[in-house]
């Protein structure tokens, strides 16, 4: 793997994955919400792209290059507070994950890794 895309890159898991990838010589495109980048390092091999989950279908057109190997999807809206109980939002997250998968395919990624959480269980319970 030489190039990776990470959504939710400024979050707890995403930022740790970005740092690990960079430390291992992988060029990373960090996809963030509203240009949030507080948890991301300054690094020559890091490109930061702002793209909302609701606009994930537009991600391929926002990238500087197209030779990405893997797509890590960690972005999720409403993972804290009252939004956790918003069934419509949690189901929308599932659709946005499908949109991310389609974007990864369009970009040419060979692998798509999506991490879940208890949110899927709580929404369905």
What residues fall within each predicted segment?
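Structural motif
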Residues: 3, 69-70, 111
């Amino acid at each position: 793997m030489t190039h990776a895309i990470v959504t939710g890159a400024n979050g707890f898991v995403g930022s740790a994955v970005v740092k690990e990838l960079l430390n291992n010589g992988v060029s990373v495109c960090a996809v963030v919400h509203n240009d949030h980048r507080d948890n991301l390092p300054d690094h020559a091999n890091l490109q930061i792209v702002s793209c909302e989950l609701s606009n994930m279908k537009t991600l391929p057109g926002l990238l500087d290059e197209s030779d990405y190997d893997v797509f890590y999807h960690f972005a999720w809206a409403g993972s804290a507070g009252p939004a956790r109980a918003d069934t419509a939002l949690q189901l929308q997250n599932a659709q946005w994950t499908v949109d991310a998968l389609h974007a990864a395919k369009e970009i040419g990624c060979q692998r798509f890794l999506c991490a879940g959480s208890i949110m899927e269980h709580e929404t369905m319970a």
